[in-house]
Amino acid sequence: MAALIEKFWFGHHPKGLMLLLNVLFWPVFWPLSKLFGFISVRRRNKYQTGEKVAYRAPVPVVVVGNITAGGNGKTPVVVWLVEQLQAKGLKPGVVSRGYGGKAPHYPYLVEDKTSTDLVGDEPVLIRRRTGAPVAVSPIRSDAVMMLLEHDVDVIITDDGLQHYALARDIEFVVIDGQRRFGNQQLLPLGPLRETCDRLADVDFLICNGGKAQKNEAPMHLQPSALINVKTGERCSINELENIVAMAGIGHPPRFFKTLEELGVTPVHCQPFTDHQAFSETELKHLAQQGQHLVMTEKDAVKCHAFAQSNWWYVPVDAVIPTSNATAIINRIIKVKEEYGSPSA
């Protein structure tokens, strides 16, 4: 059913199939979509009018989110931002909802050896890649307050554009440059969390892949040498044969296309749902279809405890043109200077 809904959202299928999907989904989803839109607008208006008061942190808050459901490449942008700010001498911290994790309490501080079972995959990935303080909580303001105890001077939120209970200074929206906004309908009739009008209010639009449109900063994900999930050994993907590829991300075909662009044709491509938990038995069985199992870095953080010696992941880095990157970092630094010292 999920696959059919995605086909309906993003189209580009034979007319007969699209007609069938319209007949199936419009009567059920249209009223729900209208209700979703009404509730979303009403909730945001309450914070804009002051009926509800958002938590304002004593340091700048930067939100990296999107207006569509699913993965658009937000986490690589968060990692990029953290690394750029660290290079400038700032001390960023990251907050996340911790989707897919079940921590014993909230807020919860992510450490180097924290399990994804507790906090989800993205927070663990961000912590291991950057070394920055990361805290998770469904109530993001609680996570922010925890990070303030760890000497941070900028807060970056991984997702949370629609979490208006947390006041923010700068907003990023990451756009899937290939799929864009689908049929431009609100959930569940389409993939939108908010209407496209919302894009006019954000500070930076980042287009992940595809052709960037007006006012969008182009970005692509640059893969590097494979890393062995178990040993940390590095090698070129072209050194491996009979690869089985797997991806448990928002849009698995993006990862499989990356492998093709690297000149690799997997013997099998296995998509999984985003944030899916994996078992050792399941992945061992999958790997037996070839000689090597290749996955995303986001999947790898969930497999370290039981990884086999023929399991590899492809690390990727967000690449943004220098002119856009300079404008982004200078804007954050300017806001930081306006705040002054968090201890002042």
From Swiss-Prot:
Pfam family, one: LpxK
Swiss-Prot/TrEMBL keywords: ATP-binding, Kinase, Lipid A biosynthesis, Lipid biosynthesis, Lipid metabolism, Nucleotide-binding, Transferase
Record's catalysed reaction(s): a lipid A disaccharide + ATP = a lipid IVA + ADP + H(+)
GO cellular component, one term: plasma membrane
GO process annotations (BP): lipid A biosynthetic process; lipopolysaccharide core region biosynthetic process
SUPFAM superfamilies the record matches: P-loop containing nucleoside triphosphate hydrolases
Transmembrane regions: none
Residues annotated for ATP binding in this entry: T68, A69, G70, G71, N72, G73, K74, T75
Gene Ontology molecular function: ATP binding; tetraacyldisaccharide 4'-kinase activity
UniProt key word Disulfide bond: no
Disulfide bonds: none
Keyword ATP-binding included in the entry's annotation: yes
Pathway: Glycolipid biosynthesis; lipid IV(A) biosynthesis; lipid IV(A) from (3R)-3-hydroxytetradecanoyl-[acyl-carrier-protein] and UDP-N-acetyl-alpha-D-glucosamine: step 6/6
Enzyme Commission number(s) of this protein: 2.7.1.130
Family: Belongs to the LpxK family.
HAMAP family: LpxK (MF_00409)
NCBIfam families found in the cross-reference section: lpxK
PANTHER family listed in its UniProt record: TETRAACYLDISACCHARIDE 4'-KINASE (PTHR42724), TETRAACYLDISACCHARIDE 4'-KINASE, MITOCHONDRIAL-RELATED (PTHR42724:SF1)
Purpose: Transfers the gamma-phosphate of ATP to the 4'-position of a tetraacyldisaccharide 1-phosphate intermediate (termed DS-1-P) to form tetraacyldisaccharide 1,4'-bis-phosphate (lipid IVA).
Protein name listed in UniProt: Tetraacyldisaccharide 4'-kinase
